[in-house]
Amino acid sequence: MILSQGTSPLKGDFSRIKFSIASPESILAHSRGEVLKPETINYRTFKPERDGLMCEKIFGPTKDWECYCGKYKRVRYKGIICDRCGVEVTTKSVRRERMGHISLAVPVVHTWFFRSVPSKIGALLDLSTKELERIIYYEVYVVINPGEPGEKQGIKKLDRLTEEQYFQIITEYEDNQDLDDHDPNKFVAKMGGEAIHMLLKNIDLDETAVHLRTVLRESNSEQKRTDALKRLKVVESFRKSYEPHKKSRKKPNALFAEDDMPEPYVYEGNKPEYMVMEVIPVIPPELRPLVPLEGGRFATSDLNDLYRRVIIRNNRLKKLIDIRAPEVILRNEKRMLQEAVDALFDNSRKANAVKTGESNRPLKSLSDALKGKQGRFRQNLLGKRVDYSGRSVIVVGPELKLHECGLPKSMAIELFQPFVIRRLVDRGIAKSVKSAKKLIDRKDPVVWDVLEKVIDGRPVMLNRAPTLHRLGIQAFQPHLVEGKAIQIHPLVCTAFNADFDGDQMAVHIPLSQEAQLEASLLMLSAHNLILPQSGKPVTVPSQDMVLGMYYLTKSRGGEMGEGRIFYSAEEVRIAYNEQLVGLHAQIFMRYDGQVDQKFDAIRVMETFVEPTSEKAAWLRKQLDEKRMVLTTVGRVIFNQHVPESIGFINRVIDKKVAKELIGRLSSEVGNVETAKFLDNIKEVGFHYAMKGGLSVGLSDAIVPETKAKHIKNAQRDSTKVVKEYNRGTLTDNERYNQIVDVWQKTSNIVAEESYQKLKRDREGFNPLYMMLDSGARGSREQVRQLTGMRGLIARPQKSMSGQPGEIIENPIISNLKEGLTVLEYFISTHGARKGLSDTSLKTADAGYLTRRLHDVAQDVIVTIDDCGTTRGLYVHRNIEEETSGQIKFREKIKGRVAARDIVDTVTGNVLVQAGEIITEELADSIQETAGVEEAEIRSVLTCESKVGICSKCYGTNLSVHQLVEIGEAVGVIAAQSIGEPGTQLTLRTFHQGGAAQGGISETETKAFCDGQVQFEDVKTVAHTAMNEDGMEDVRTIVIQKNGKINIIDSESGKLLKRYMLPHGAHLACEDGVLVKKDQVLFRSEPNSTQIIAELPGTIKFADIEKGVTYKEEVDPQTGFSQHTIINWRTKLRATETREPRLLILDENGEVRKTYPVPIKSNLYVEDGQKVLPGDILAKVPRNLDRVGGDITAGLPKVTELFEARIPTDPAIVSEIDGYVSFGAQRRSSKEIKVKNDFGEEKVYYVQVGKHVLANEGDEVKAGDPLTDGAVSPQDILRIQGPNAVQQYLVNEIQKVYQINAGVEINDKHLEVIVRQMLQKVRIEEPGDTDLLPGDLIDRSAFIEANRAISEKVRISERGDAPARIQENQLHKLRDITKLNRELRKNSKKMVAYEPALQATSHPVLLGITSAALQTESVISAASFQETTKVLTDAAVAGKVDYLVGLKENVIVGKLIPAGTGLKKYKTIKLVGEESAPAPVVVEAVVSHEAEASPMVEEEVAE
């Protein structure tokens, strides 16, 4: 591979790297000499052998400034080549860069190009890998030129011949051997690398390309076209590798400085024959070291062994050729040489890999050195070890300020030693470096003073592994502490995900001035208070601090000093200190500022002040006029730390309130004030947690007395269910679901009662309740298990794919306070163990997801301010989502730029103008405005920047609440924001001890709020049935599939909530009535889908035959039978077919309605039975997802969405709007037709047994599913286009994070990733561009290719044009017009032309793995996965990596092109204000001194 870097050698600055196949000339140009012997070093002297693999003459001296024989020593002989031993006198570091070579006796094929899929050599020669292998490994001859003998025998070029056939021709035509090799009449056939070399050399790439394009255009055979396309891709790759170099002939060399280059060579692009090697490069010896161990043994790199085998076999082959050995022996030796070279380049590909002697492991070849986690890319280039760093255990430092950390003295002195030594010498305390070191070793007191001065104002960086997001590394101001542990501030623990049970952290020292500046300005912990993933604060008090603040601000009736009136906060403080009022006493205080409270002060006041008294009247007036506030002593103390501009916080401070408050502070008063506030409330929190002395005893867990009664009721209900099952009215599935339901409800009732009991205990001062209510520790779920009942337990799942685990139907009735019986204990161990094993297994999955996300988005950087697009994304107000606790409308538009004016449709007011940022205040007002149903916002998904994205489309940077700056690496932030909670999700299970949560299948649906009922698409029938008491009961039953009930505001008509009506639901309300909150709207059966009669008539079974399409299951306990439809295909012959369905006949026996019955349905009617509208004909059981809060279902779901996988058993989706009709029934499928009014018809074949959602005559829209199953994102893209699929992916991923884990991620981050998944298009028709059909290319490259030919025309008739103009060529329109003018002037025939045909394409949705591999950057893709494949393809095509992403720049050791590393900052120089000269002079200053200071203060000339 050749590295190229534009215009200057690698040691300077380079802007791109070109990959290509190394020609023999380039290998020789890099080489310093030929390695002739397999020896490495002399076993006695330990010095390298001459001409061996470690030879000093070739690779340079092993000691600095000393030749091999010792004739020249010392630096003064620099550059002299010793006349005795031939070694150049130079530094030993050249042994890291000087290469050698091995000249092979016969050409050898490079295994990468032969074994890669598809095989590059195979594609060029049109040979299969199997056939190639037989030629390369000397099994058959291949015909290179058939000549006359071949023609007579009917042998064509590339035919394979066995040895017998070959010798037969040779003996038959003896004079053939005398002809010259280039004579077209000579018969030539060879084998091995030599044959391949000759064949490849004879290929005319241009001719092959033309031929293959013709086949593509004209062939009717699909197979031929596929093969031609496969070959054409490789041919075009080789042709492309020439293109950029037609102008420049000389090519600078990457591996040497110019004065160091052995001999220039001209780079011509890749030639096919370069894939066969005549010389092999030998890498520098320092990169394959040989290290002496004790006891006279050596540790050596595997590469030395592999090179030795090549050299030994090569030398032996040369000798055999010299002595004219028999062909059989030669052939065997040549094959062994080929195998040795294969092993050297890629040992892992081979079935019989070369193994080591002792441990019998395969040797690590050159490819293995690059591949995988331990390979060069990931181990050494992306993850380097750093000096000036240390690590230690962390402990809490409660007295630290937010921006400080405690650094142990012993660690600090070690880290800052060079700086301390310099200070000691400068101040004259120590005479020399050596004596300064002695002072430090003695731990002289003066050293500590100097150290204090050195670290003053120098930030250090702390990092805790795993670093899942950018808050995992933060900068702090160090404080010297005794001991050996690092101290950290309690509030930064959340960001680091640290606790003090033995966690360790690493310390890094930023050395340069620029690094210190960035650390203290950008990375200081006090500047990182907001989570980039959601814009919410991360430095939130937790545990003791929350408990302390909650205890402090809670009120209690009857405390000492209740109802007293105070003049000011100071007065309250004095009274409290003098013990005249209690901490929780309700008092009145003069305050005329803004008050944040959520209670009615006058009503509370009347509970402890006589309402009719004069005092009460006066207080009422004061409270009304907002001149006084009713509060508690504790809240007054708390508010002394709140900045005045925020007002008086008159609420109980729990974790949620604290989080809101910190969020408000950071946006309203800035980070400095917020950091002060945080430090203050930390002190307050800890202090009052101590004052309260809150601890939990066994007596604090109170079990409600009513528990026994509820359990008795539940046991009664479950017995009733079992009885019904025994009577045969329920299936086993329904029995199970109903029993689980009964216990789930009981469990929830008991939990609620125990919670309420705790709440009432000691006026809410029960320590357990306070911990729970404040959010300090524990959850309602845990309280339920302590004082209620443990409830139902999930069975552990077998599969990892996230199928729901069954729930054990016998609940655990005891709670943890009462203690479990042996059986209960045994059942509950299930969940506990599963939690632990899950945690360890899933962390790896989440980590891998994060890695793929990083790789796909690492080059998304904000590059420009505005891309100027007119497109935007429509965000709708979705009532269902908002009321079910998902992301609100305001959250979706907050921090975005409006694409169009947002107008209140009721008043016509413009709320936000196009191009304006929607701030938090604006978003709130839009949320409250009923007249705004949707808003069009700028989005990353519609951004049209060519490279990266623009800041207007991204919107605000969530962590600073301002428009994102140019240079922000938003891709990496997006990947971190999605990956970090992914790891959190994983660790979700074990807190519940495996207790089952999830759907109580609610059979009654109640109104969410007061309002008016409005039916939408509701079709019903009245149905009379017997109720449990034997009385007649008339019910209204829904018979339409997609009906809805809306609840609207009766005055404004605004939609408040929407409910989907299930098929077969019983309505409990009427259209247009007013309902109250929690009034029942409808009842439905949650565990099955019902098939309901819509008309009266008689049932007839069609294709429902016992033992064929249904089985009769007689329940052994009850003796009742149940008819279940079965998969009948297993019972019938291949030609037969069945379609089970129920028919409703009228009196004349005519069919009025047909109902297909899917497999697994249970029939509820008999053949010939009379039915009425609303009768249940059959039930199709649903699989209910009743698993505990286990994200197992979540993580695979997220992965499936990001990888754009087609779900198992996807739904069939209609491609057009139209009406459904059913067609013919085949053996294994039935036809569904969708036809529209324009006569367009689409036919779909549905597998028998799949549940069809659409009925005959139903109207469907494009994109509606016709059958059950998950919709495939690929279908959405095909039918509804890229916008729909982008929205679908973002919403679905959000749902998983929201519902499964309650994690908030801003849509922006998901949009960035989804944008990357849709960056590519697939070429349909290439037109006149040089693209290939089926090519996958970047959308911008596609637009560019079309733009390039937009001004060109294709010549259809050349007329009397000059010879350079031929038919079917492309030329610029203006050139041809000019030429035609000339031709017309000379009365000649003009050129006829037509416009060049543009290419057409369709968008492609790639999963994140393939999107990361398809990236434009070779280096980035190679370091991600499939390293050899990526590099092989890049080398063949002569690809250039322009180093635009972050990863490739890290790998080549440059600053990343983001943040302060942006290119435009390189040429900026800081100039003092008074001395700033005219701009021209500044430019001169800049260009001369640009090297000196890479840091930026002020932008001057670019």
From Swiss-Prot:
The keyword Transferase applies. SUPFAM superfamilies: beta and beta-prime subunits of DNA dependent RNA-polymerase. GO terms for molecular function: DNA binding; DNA-directed RNA polymerase activity; magnesium ion binding; zinc ion binding. It catalyses: RNA(n) + a ribonucleoside 5'-triphosphate = RNA(n+1) + diphosphate. Binds 1 Mg(2+) ion per subunit. SMART domains: RPOLA_N. It comes from the Bacteria. It is an enzyme of class 2 (transferase). This is DNA-directed RNA polymerase subunit beta'. It comes from Chlorobium chlorochromatii (strain CaD3).
